[in-house]
Amino acid sequence: HSDLRRQRQMCIRDRVRTSDVVVSSLDHPVDFHALVDSGINKPARYMGHELGVEPRDWQTATVRWALTYPEIYEVGSSNLGHIILYSILNAVPGQLCDRAYLPAADLAGRLRERSQALFAVESRRPLPAFDILGFSLSYELGATNILEMLDLAQVPIRAADRGDLPLSDPAAPPLIFAGGPTATSNPEPYAPFFDFIALGDGEELLPEIGLVVAQAKADGLTRSQLLRDLAQVPGVYVPSLYGTGADGVTLKPLHPDLPARVLRRVATPMPHYATGLVPHVETVHDRLTVEIRRGCTRGCRFCQPGMLTRPARDVEPEAVIEAVETGMKQTGYSDFSLLSLSCSDYLALPAVGVELRNRLADQNVTLQLPS
């Protein structure tokens, strides 16, 4: 596996070339080879088209998503939630989902030097060309990386500055939203920067958002009209449609048809979407990861995800086994990990471990469990 990766890296190095011409039009992909040449460290970070990526038609997609994890590629590309949502959206007819990550300082400097917007790694389209740009906010310190990515993408940082053009207008900025445990636990510090915030689990919520956006584009709705429609979707919080009450603290809807309280979404884990892509470079979690349990019954007050992801939901043992077996065959990884806030609380763990050992006995693979 490592030998194949090194060979791919050498091929990538051979393919990059130096040029001063960069395509900045939103109608076309960026001139990748002019932007990411041999002067950029680890160019394979930005190549995209990893093992497991399926080509998608930009022109026929009705809604184009770019999901981002606001860290460098080695961190973001191995995030399980990021991969699951990416896979789910690409399984929805008419929807296209690409990925983007925080560029390292050398590429960020070159993007600014050449006035080129940050681009997605598969289509290599500038991020302003997408309909929806989503950020995973997993911890507070990631917020500044989001602002950096918005600036690099040449998207107005504050939601109030993004105008009211219909999303179908080429000049309209994409819808900017955040999700993840930090955005769910306390969205208000980040509210000025997002058109909406997705609260709770996204597996079922994001496809619903995509359907609303597709209809809004077909109807030619303005940005504000679309946000009014999105606010009716359970789990979607639109900060611009809420204001503080008389006490200056409590949030109240500005329109009577809006929900007074936005509740987070709770979804059933979908391990069959967890089969990740095999990156061109080594990542922080360089293995297959399959979720076996979401939530926790311990109730430790210091544990944010344990308090937020309730109730605890176990994945069916056979679904875990099939996801691991399929994923190992498709990726070629030699290691896999079973993920949970507390793996020892997954009652089927011994039986799953024995069955996986029996099925994968001749493949010389290693099981890792989080501490």
Predicted regions and their residues:
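Low-complexity, highly charged intrinsically disordered N-terminal segments
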Residues: W65, P70, G76-S87, A91-D98, ...
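Glycine-rich beta-alpha loop elements in corrinoid/cobalamin-binding modules
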Residues: L102-K252
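Iron-sulfur (Fe-S) cluster-binding segments and ferredoxin-like electron-carrier domains
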Residues: C303-A319
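N-terminal [4Fe-4S]-dependent radical SAM core
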Residues: V36-A66, Y73-E74, P239, T244-T289
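Conserved SAM/AdoMet-binding glycine-rich loop
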Residues: L67-I72, L141, T326-S371
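N-terminal pre-triad scaffold of radical SAM enzymes
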Residues: L67-E71, Y86-L89, L277-R301, M328, ...
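Single conserved hydrophobic/aromatic residue that forms the stacking wall/gate
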Residues: H1-D14
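Helix-enriched interaction subdomains in cytosolic or periplasmic regions
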Residues: V16-P43, V92
